[in-house]
Amino acid sequence: MPDSIKKELTRPYGFLFTNNDIFINFILEKKNNRLITVGDVVTSTLYDRNIIPFLSIIDGKTKRQIKVKTVNENVIKVKNEKSTIRFSVMKIIKNLLDKNERATILVDGEEDLLVIPVVIFGRNNDIIVYGQPNAGAVVIINNHFVKIRVKQILEKFYVKKC
C-alpha cells in the first residue's frame, strides 16, 4: 500500500459510533441485513450482546487485549501481511459472500484492510462494521457509491508477489 493512501484510510467511511449502546441499537434495527465485521473489538462487542455476524474477519490481536471467541463453525485461516490485501484472501471473501456462506476468517497477520474487498464484493444494504482506533465503531451501509469510492482507493494500491 502506498504511503499516500494511509492518511486517507484513517478517516471513517461510514457512521462513527462512540457509544456502544447506540451502536448496538442501530445494528439491531438492521437485523434483516447481512452483518459483516472486520476487527476483534467490534466483533467481540457484538458477540457479547449475542449478535452473531454473518461474516467476521479477525486477527486475534487488539490494543485492548480482548480475546475473541469464534462462534461460527466455519473458521477459515488465512495469511495477510500488514498493509496488504492478498489476492487469495480477496477470493475467499468473494466466494463466501457470493455463496451466502457464514464464516469467521481468522487472519494470521493483519485484517484492517480487508474491509476493502468486503465492500467491493458485498451486497447493497449489507451492514459492514469495522473498528476506528481510539474512536469507536464505523458502520457502512453498503451501496453502489461506497463501492465506487473503495474501488478508487484500491486502484491506488500496487501489485507485488507475496
From Swiss-Prot:
It is an enzyme of class 2 (transferase). Pfam families: DUF359 (PF04019). Keywords: Coenzyme A biosynthesis, GTP-binding, Kinase, Nucleotide-binding, Transferase. GTP binds at residues 40-42, 59, 61, 111. GO terms for biological process: coenzyme A biosynthetic process. Signal peptide: none annotated. One of its GO terms (molecular function) is kinase activity. The keyword Protein biosynthesis does not apply. InterPro entries: GTP-dep_dephospho-CoA_kin. The keyword Transferase applies. It catalyses: 3'-dephospho-CoA + GTP = GDP + CoA + H(+). Its EC number is 2.7.1.237. Catalyzes the GTP-dependent phosphorylation of the 3'-hydroxyl group of dephosphocoenzyme A to form coenzyme A (CoA). PANTHER family: GTP-DEPENDENT DEPHOSPHO-COA KINASE, UPF0218 PROTEIN TK1697. Belongs to the GTP-dependent DPCK family. This is GTP-dependent dephospho-CoA kinase. It comes from Sulfurisphaera tokodaii (strain DSM 16993 / JCM 10545 / NBRC 100140 / 7) (Sulfolobus tokodaii).
